[in-house]
Amino acid sequence: MVKNKQLELVNAGWSMHDEACPIYEDMINNMKIGHDFVLKEFGIKPRIGWQIDPFGHSNYNARLFAELGFDAWFFARLDVFDKAKRSDEINLEYVHIPSTDYLGEDTRIFEHVLWNHYEAPPGFNWDMVQDDPGFITNTKDFYYNAP
């Protein structure tokens, strides 16, 4: 499934760093261990960063993920006032530029702040608790409900 691109492995660190590995060298080692494993076992290199619940991010996270070759980084936890402002302005997706003084353009990375931390947006939460109805896209089906 991974090789057929039916399943995407994201982040692929040994653990979700920043709370577990706050030192830059440890962040690098954490990602190296995970990426080496994924490359050996699946023959792929992850392209997406995913950090749903570390307690804070340093500016180095964006830099590290960009230098790892990630196309994007998805995360949930950020300053409550920053999140409110970005939500009001419909700006939860942006290009993060951690530093260009010494690093150049390669450190830019697309970032997406998750809508409501662990929850999917209304209508897209298909777990056992919320049980939103799935989309039936066949127009001939009695239960058709796609937008």
Residue ranges and their predicted role:
Residues M1-P147:
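Catalytic-domain carbohydrate-binding cleft regions of carbohydrate-active enzymes
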